[in-house]
Amino acid sequence: MAVNKVEINGVVKLDLTQDTVTAAKLAHGETAHDARGELITGTMTAPQLQIAVTTSAGATVTATKGSKTVSGTADASGNCTLTVDETGTWMLTVSTDKYTVTADVTVGTNTLELYPGPACDPVFANNDWATIVAACQTKTVPASWKVGDSKVMAVLGAGDIQVDIIGKNHDDYADGSGKAPLTLQFHKCIDYGKMNSSSENSMGWKNCTMRTTTMANALKWIPADLRSSVRAVKKKTASKGNSSTAAVTTTSDKMFLLSEVEVLNTTSQSVSGEGTQYEYYKTVANQKKVSYSSTSTANWWLRSPRKTDATSFLILYFNGTKGSASDSYSNNSNWTAPAFCF
Protein backbone atom coordinates (compact mmCIF):
# COMPACT_ATOMS: atom_id res chain seq x y z
CA MET A 1 0.00 0.00 0.00
CA ALA A 2 1.15 3.53 -0.65
CA VAL A 3 -0.30 4.72 2.67
CA ASN A 4 -0.76 2.12 5.39
CA LYS A 5 0.06 3.92 8.62
CA VAL A 6 -1.43 7.13 10.00
CA GLU A 7 0.14 9.16 12.80
CA ILE A 8 -1.16 12.44 14.24
CA ASN A 9 1.12 14.40 16.58
CA GLY A 10 3.26 11.30 17.06
CA VAL A 11 0.31 9.04 17.99
CA VAL A 12 -0.49 6.05 15.75
CA LYS A 13 -4.16 6.21 14.81
CA LEU A 14 -4.22 3.49 12.12
CA ASP A 15 -1.57 0.84 11.36
CA LEU A 16 -1.97 -1.49 8.38
CA THR A 17 1.70 -2.19 7.84
CA GLN A 18 1.08 -5.97 8.01
CA ASP A 19 -1.59 -5.83 5.31
CA THR A 20 -1.17 -8.12 2.30
CA VAL A 21 -3.80 -6.57 0.10
CA THR A 22 -2.96 -3.96 -2.50
CA ALA A 23 -4.21 -0.43 -2.57
CA ALA A 24 -6.06 -1.12 -5.81
CA LYS A 25 -7.96 -4.05 -4.24
CA LEU A 26 -8.83 -1.97 -1.19
CA ALA A 27 -10.26 0.67 -3.49
CA HIS A 28 -12.62 -2.00 -4.88
CA GLY A 29 -13.84 -3.03 -1.44
CA GLU A 30 -11.56 -5.95 -0.54
CA THR A 31 -11.03 -6.37 3.22
CA ALA A 32 -7.50 -6.10 4.57
CA HIS A 33 -5.92 -9.16 6.26
CA ASP A 34 -2.48 -9.89 7.56
CA ALA A 35 -0.17 -12.69 6.42
CA ARG A 36 -1.98 -15.18 8.68
CA GLY A 37 -5.29 -14.29 7.10
CA GLU A 38 -6.58 -12.43 10.15
CA LEU A 39 -8.71 -9.36 9.66
CA ILE A 40 -6.85 -6.10 10.29
CA THR A 41 -8.92 -3.45 12.03
CA GLY A 42 -8.09 0.13 12.88
CA THR A 43 -9.74 3.01 14.64
CA MET A 44 -9.46 6.64 13.80
CA THR A 45 -10.65 9.51 16.01
CA ALA A 46 -10.79 12.64 13.94
CA PRO A 47 -9.16 15.65 15.61
CA GLN A 48 -11.56 18.40 16.68
CA LEU A 49 -11.50 21.57 14.67
CA GLN A 50 -11.59 24.53 17.03
CA ILE A 51 -11.57 28.31 17.04
CA ALA A 52 -10.21 29.79 20.29
CA VAL A 53 -11.00 33.40 21.19
CA THR A 54 -9.99 35.69 24.04
CA THR A 55 -12.44 38.54 24.49
CA SER A 56 -14.60 40.38 27.03
CA ALA A 57 -16.11 38.18 29.75
CA GLY A 58 -19.71 37.29 28.90
CA ALA A 59 -19.41 38.25 25.23
CA THR A 60 -21.32 36.19 22.66
CA VAL A 61 -18.99 34.59 20.11
CA THR A 62 -20.39 33.36 16.78
CA ALA A 63 -18.55 31.67 13.90
CA THR A 64 -20.23 31.59 10.48
CA LYS A 65 -19.24 29.86 7.25
CA GLY A 66 -21.87 29.80 4.54
CA SER A 67 -25.04 28.41 6.10
CA LYS A 68 -23.19 26.98 9.11
CA THR A 69 -23.22 28.81 12.46
CA VAL A 70 -21.64 27.91 15.81
CA SER A 71 -22.00 30.08 18.93
CA GLY A 72 -20.70 30.26 22.48
CA THR A 73 -20.25 32.61 25.43
CA ALA A 74 -16.92 33.79 26.83
CA ASP A 75 -16.28 32.67 30.40
CA ALA A 76 -15.34 34.90 33.33
CA SER A 77 -11.73 34.99 32.07
CA GLY A 78 -12.85 36.03 28.59
CA ASN A 79 -12.09 32.67 26.95
CA CYS A 80 -14.35 30.95 24.43
CA THR A 81 -13.60 27.90 22.27
CA LEU A 82 -15.91 26.94 19.41
CA THR A 83 -15.85 23.47 17.84
CA VAL A 84 -16.56 23.55 14.10
CA ASP A 85 -16.89 20.78 11.53
CA GLU A 86 -15.03 22.27 8.62
CA THR A 87 -11.60 23.71 7.93
CA GLY A 88 -11.00 26.99 6.19
CA THR A 89 -11.92 30.56 6.98
CA TRP A 90 -14.86 31.43 9.21
CA MET A 91 -16.31 34.86 9.95
CA LEU A 92 -16.16 35.52 13.68
CA THR A 93 -18.55 37.95 15.38
CA VAL A 94 -18.08 38.98 19.01
CA SER A 95 -20.82 41.00 20.70
CA THR A 96 -21.45 42.58 24.09
CA ASP A 97 -24.52 44.53 25.14
CA LYS A 98 -23.01 47.70 23.63
CA TYR A 99 -20.50 46.77 20.94
CA THR A 100 -19.86 44.30 18.12
CA VAL A 101 -16.68 43.43 16.25
CA THR A 102 -16.04 40.99 13.38
CA ALA A 103 -12.98 39.32 11.92
CA ASP A 104 -12.09 36.44 9.62
CA VAL A 105 -10.26 33.55 11.26
CA THR A 106 -8.70 30.39 9.85
CA VAL A 107 -9.36 27.18 11.76
CA GLY A 108 -6.25 25.88 13.52
CA THR A 109 -4.52 29.22 14.01
CA ASN A 110 -3.47 30.57 17.40
CA THR A 111 -5.97 32.04 19.85
CA LEU A 112 -7.47 35.23 18.46
CA GLU A 113 -7.86 38.28 20.70
CA LEU A 114 -10.98 40.17 19.70
CA TYR A 115 -12.61 42.79 21.90
CA PRO A 116 -15.80 44.66 20.94
CA GLY A 117 -15.42 48.36 21.56
CA PRO A 118 -16.39 51.86 20.47
CA ALA A 119 -15.57 53.45 17.15
CA CYS A 120 -12.44 55.44 17.97
CA ASP A 121 -10.82 58.29 16.10
CA PRO A 122 -7.19 57.33 15.39
CA VAL A 123 -6.13 60.70 16.84
CA PHE A 124 -6.34 60.47 20.64
CA ALA A 125 -7.27 64.12 21.21
CA ASN A 126 -10.18 63.94 18.76
CA ASN A 127 -12.09 61.48 20.96
CA ASP A 128 -14.35 62.51 23.81
CA TRP A 129 -13.53 61.17 27.26
CA ALA A 130 -16.46 58.74 27.23
CA THR A 131 -15.00 57.08 24.13
CA ILE A 132 -11.53 56.94 25.68
CA VAL A 133 -12.94 55.31 28.82
CA ALA A 134 -14.88 52.76 26.75
CA ALA A 135 -11.80 51.93 24.65
CA CYS A 136 -9.76 51.32 27.81
CA GLN A 137 -12.37 49.21 29.54
CA THR A 138 -13.09 47.09 26.45
CA LYS A 139 -9.36 46.83 25.68
CA THR A 140 -9.84 48.26 22.19
CA VAL A 141 -7.38 51.16 22.39
CA PRO A 142 -6.12 51.85 18.85
CA ALA A 143 -2.45 51.33 18.12
CA SER A 144 -2.41 54.89 16.76
CA TRP A 145 -2.83 56.29 20.29
CA LYS A 146 0.78 56.80 21.31
CA VAL A 147 2.67 57.55 24.51
CA GLY A 148 2.97 61.34 24.64
CA ASP A 149 -0.45 61.96 23.10
CA SER A 150 -2.61 64.26 25.19
CA LYS A 151 -6.14 65.58 25.58
CA VAL A 152 -7.57 68.41 27.65
CA MET A 153 -9.65 67.60 30.73
CA ALA A 154 -11.68 70.06 32.80
CA VAL A 155 -10.12 69.74 36.27
CA LEU A 156 -12.01 71.00 39.29
CA GLY A 157 -10.25 74.06 40.70
CA ALA A 158 -7.51 74.08 38.06
CA GLY A 159 -9.35 74.66 34.79
CA ASP A 160 -8.56 72.91 31.52
CA ILE A 161 -5.47 70.76 32.02
CA GLN A 162 -3.70 68.61 29.45
CA VAL A 163 -3.68 64.89 30.32
CA ASP A 164 -0.83 62.81 28.86
CA ILE A 165 -0.56 59.14 27.97
CA ILE A 166 2.56 58.16 29.93
CA GLY A 167 2.34 54.39 29.40
CA LYS A 168 0.52 51.71 27.45
CA ASN A 169 -0.11 48.30 29.03
CA HIS A 170 2.18 49.32 31.88
CA ASP A 171 0.08 49.02 35.05
CA ASP A 172 -1.80 45.97 36.33
CA TYR A 173 -5.44 46.32 37.32
CA ALA A 174 -5.85 45.62 41.03
CA ASP A 175 -8.68 43.15 40.40
CA GLY A 176 -6.40 40.85 38.41
CA SER A 177 -8.10 41.47 35.06
CA GLY A 178 -4.87 42.25 33.24
CA LYS A 179 -3.07 45.37 32.08
CA ALA A 180 -4.58 48.83 31.97
CA PRO A 181 -4.35 49.83 28.28
CA LEU A 182 -3.40 53.41 29.18
CA THR A 183 -1.81 55.14 32.15
CA LEU A 184 -2.65 58.84 32.19
CA GLN A 185 -1.15 61.74 34.14
CA PHE A 186 -1.88 65.43 34.48
CA HIS A 187 0.63 67.37 32.42
CA LYS A 188 0.75 70.15 35.00
CA CYS A 189 0.83 69.88 38.76
CA ILE A 190 -2.69 70.43 40.08
CA ASP A 191 -2.34 70.41 43.87
CA TYR A 192 0.11 71.49 46.56
CA GLY A 193 0.47 69.54 49.78
CA LYS A 194 2.37 67.42 52.30
CA MET A 195 3.24 63.76 52.21
CA ASN A 196 2.61 63.47 55.93
CA SER A 197 1.55 65.62 58.86
CA SER A 198 4.89 64.99 60.60
CA SER A 199 8.44 64.82 59.28
CA GLU A 200 8.76 61.04 59.16
CA ASN A 201 8.56 58.35 56.51
CA SER A 202 8.30 55.18 58.58
CA MET A 203 4.75 54.60 57.34
CA GLY A 204 5.86 54.48 53.72
CA TRP A 205 3.51 55.32 50.87
CA LYS A 206 0.86 52.86 52.05
CA ASN A 207 -0.02 54.77 55.22
CA CYS A 208 1.10 58.33 54.53
CA THR A 209 -1.38 61.20 54.58
CA MET A 210 -0.83 61.91 50.90
CA ARG A 211 -2.19 58.47 49.98
CA THR A 212 -4.80 57.88 52.67
CA THR A 213 -6.33 61.36 52.53
CA THR A 214 -5.18 63.51 49.60
CA MET A 215 -5.15 60.83 46.89
CA ALA A 216 -8.19 59.13 48.41
CA ASN A 217 -10.11 62.35 47.76
CA ALA A 218 -8.39 63.17 44.48
CA LEU A 219 -11.19 61.83 42.29
CA LYS A 220 -12.80 65.21 42.87
CA TRP A 221 -10.37 66.57 40.26
CA ILE A 222 -11.82 64.25 37.62
CA PRO A 223 -15.07 65.36 35.90
CA ALA A 224 -18.08 63.93 37.75
CA ASP A 225 -19.25 61.77 34.84
CA LEU A 226 -15.85 60.02 34.67
CA ARG A 227 -15.07 59.43 38.34
CA SER A 228 -16.72 56.02 38.59
CA SER A 229 -14.71 54.86 35.56
CA VAL A 230 -11.30 55.35 37.20
CA ARG A 231 -9.97 51.89 38.07
CA ALA A 232 -7.55 50.85 40.78
CA VAL A 233 -4.14 49.51 39.78
CA LYS A 234 -1.34 47.86 41.73
CA LYS A 235 1.56 50.08 42.81
CA LYS A 236 4.76 48.87 44.49
CA THR A 237 6.57 51.03 47.02
CA ALA A 238 9.01 50.64 49.92
CA SER A 239 7.19 49.92 53.17
CA LYS A 240 9.29 52.53 54.99
CA GLY A 241 12.18 54.97 54.63
CA ASN A 242 15.65 54.98 56.19
CA SER A 243 16.40 51.48 54.89
CA SER A 244 18.03 50.25 51.70
CA THR A 245 16.52 46.81 52.29
CA ALA A 246 12.95 47.81 53.15
CA ALA A 247 10.32 45.40 51.92
CA VAL A 248 8.33 46.53 48.91
CA THR A 249 4.58 46.47 49.47
CA THR A 250 1.77 46.53 46.91
CA THR A 251 -1.13 48.93 47.23
CA SER A 252 -4.34 49.32 45.27
CA ASP A 253 -4.60 52.91 44.03
CA LYS A 254 -7.01 54.83 41.82
CA MET A 255 -5.04 58.08 41.99
CA PHE A 256 -1.33 57.80 42.66
CA LEU A 257 2.03 59.52 42.54
CA LEU A 258 4.95 58.08 40.59
CA SER A 259 8.11 56.57 42.07
CA GLU A 260 11.71 57.56 41.41
CA VAL A 261 12.34 54.66 39.06
CA GLU A 262 9.06 55.20 37.18
CA VAL A 263 10.23 58.68 36.19
CA LEU A 264 14.03 58.58 36.14
CA ASN A 265 14.84 54.87 35.78
CA THR A 266 17.15 55.25 38.80
CA THR A 267 17.09 54.19 42.44
CA SER A 268 19.66 56.65 43.74
CA GLN A 269 17.60 57.49 46.82
CA SER A 270 14.92 54.80 46.82
CA VAL A 271 14.87 51.02 47.06
CA SER A 272 14.64 48.84 43.97
CA GLY A 273 11.36 47.21 43.06
CA GLU A 274 9.11 50.28 42.90
CA GLY A 275 8.03 49.63 39.32
CA THR A 276 9.63 50.36 35.96
CA GLN A 277 10.11 53.56 34.01
CA TYR A 278 7.15 54.86 32.05
CA GLU A 279 7.82 55.25 28.34
CA TYR A 280 6.85 58.94 28.49
CA TYR A 281 9.66 59.77 30.90
CA LYS A 282 12.36 58.27 28.73
CA THR A 283 12.21 61.67 27.04
CA VAL A 284 14.10 63.83 29.55
CA ALA A 285 12.26 67.04 28.69
CA ASN A 286 9.02 65.44 29.90
CA GLN A 287 10.40 65.26 33.44
CA LYS A 288 9.91 69.02 33.78
CA LYS A 289 6.55 70.16 35.16
CA VAL A 290 4.96 73.46 36.05
CA SER A 291 1.93 74.12 38.21
CA TYR A 292 -1.47 74.92 36.75
CA SER A 293 -1.14 78.47 38.09
CA SER A 294 2.42 79.30 37.01
CA THR A 295 4.99 78.89 34.28
CA SER A 296 7.82 78.37 36.77
CA THR A 297 9.39 74.92 37.09
CA ALA A 298 7.79 73.00 39.95
CA ASN A 299 9.26 70.46 42.34
CA TRP A 300 6.77 67.61 42.44
CA TRP A 301 6.31 64.78 44.91
CA LEU A 302 7.26 61.20 44.16
CA ARG A 303 5.77 58.44 46.30
CA SER A 304 9.18 56.94 47.17
CA PRO A 305 10.33 57.28 50.81
CA ARG A 306 14.01 58.22 51.00
CA LYS A 307 16.11 55.19 51.88
CA THR A 308 18.86 57.14 53.71
CA ASP A 309 16.86 59.05 56.32
CA ALA A 310 13.73 58.72 58.43
CA THR A 311 12.24 62.13 57.64
CA SER A 312 11.89 62.52 53.87
CA PHE A 313 10.10 61.45 50.74
CA LEU A 314 11.48 62.19 47.30
CA ILE A 315 10.64 65.02 44.95
CA LEU A 316 11.41 65.42 41.26
CA TYR A 317 13.74 68.38 40.83
CA PHE A 318 14.46 69.64 37.30
CA ASN A 319 17.80 71.44 37.13
CA GLY A 320 17.36 73.05 33.72
CA THR A 321 18.49 70.15 31.55
CA LYS A 322 17.24 67.01 33.28
CA GLY A 323 15.33 65.74 36.27
CA SER A 324 16.82 64.25 39.41
CA ALA A 325 15.51 62.86 42.68
CA SER A 326 15.92 65.12 45.69
CA ASP A 327 14.63 64.85 49.23
CA SER A 328 12.07 66.92 51.07
CA TYR A 329 10.80 66.63 54.63
CA SER A 330 7.56 64.70 54.70
CA ASN A 331 5.69 67.64 56.20
CA ASN A 332 6.94 70.10 53.59
CA SER A 333 4.51 71.15 50.88
CA ASN A 334 5.31 70.41 47.23
CA TRP A 335 3.32 70.09 44.03
CA THR A 336 1.62 66.87 42.91
CA ALA A 337 0.84 65.47 39.45
CA PRO A 338 -1.35 62.39 40.02
CA ALA A 339 -1.67 59.55 37.55
CA PHE A 340 -4.63 57.23 36.97
CA CYS A 341 -6.11 54.57 34.71
CA PHE A 342 -9.57 53.88 33.25
Predicted features and spans:
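Beta-rich interaction/scaffold domains
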Residues: 1-48, 99
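Extracellular/surface recognition and adhesion modules
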Residues: 29-32, 53, 78, 94, ...
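A short, amphipathic beta-strand motif
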Residues: 49-57
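Hydrophobic beta-strand segments
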Residues: 59-63
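Short, acidic Ser/Thr/Gly-rich low-complexity loop/linker segments typical of extracellular
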Residues: 65-84
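A short, solvent-exposed beta-strand micro-motif common in secreted/extracellular proteins
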Residues: 86-98
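Structured interaction patches on ligand/partner-binding surfaces of diverse proteins
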Residues: 95-118, 256
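Collagenous Gly-X-Y triple-helix signature in extracellular proteins
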Residues: 117-342
